[in-house]
Amino acid sequence: MATILLADDDAAIRDLVRRALSSDGHTVHVTQDGVEALESLGANGAVYDILITDVDMPQLDGISLAEKALAMKPALAVVLMSGFTDQLERAARLRVRRLLSISKPFTLDQIKQVVKSVLA
C-alpha cells in the first residue's frame, strides 16, 4: 500500500478522498494547501509515494506544488485534480513520467482507480 500526501483547500474533498483511500489500506496525510503540502514533503523522514493535489488552491497552486515537489523528490508520483479542463491541459505539458490527472467531479471509485494505476 502507498503513503499518500493529499492537498486540497476543500475540507469535504479532503475528508472523502482520505476515507476512500484509507479504506483501501493506504496511509493518507492531508494538508489544506500547497504551502502546507510542500512543508510536509520537506519534513525530516517524510516519505510519500504519491502526491494528490487540487490544481486551484490559494497561495501555491497544484501545478506549482507538483513542480516544486518533483524537484525535491523526482520519484514521486503526482495526481492532479481539477474541475477546469484548461488547468489539466497546462498540467499535461509537465514532463513527468508518473503524472496523472482526474477531472472533478469524480467518484470515489475513480480516484481509487487512479491510485491503482499509479502504483501499477
What does each model-identified segment do?
Residues 7-8, 31, 51:
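Conserved sequence signature across two-component system core domains
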Residues 15-23:
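Charged docking surfaces used in two-component/phosphorelay signaling
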Residues 25-32, 39-40:
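Short hydrophobic/Thr-rich beta-strand motif most characteristic of the beta2 strand and flanking loop
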Residues 32-36, 61-65:
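Acidic catalytic/metal-coordinating carboxylates
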Residues 42-47, 68-76, 92-96:
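Conserved phosphotransfer cores of two-component systems
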Residues 57:
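Receiver (REC) domain active-site loop signature in two-component systems and cognate sites
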Residues 64, 85-103, 109, 113:
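Alpha4 helix (beta4-alpha4-beta5 surface) of REC/receiver domains from two-component response regulators
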Residues 81-82:
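Hydrophobic/aromatic residues positioned on beta-strands within the core alpha/beta folds
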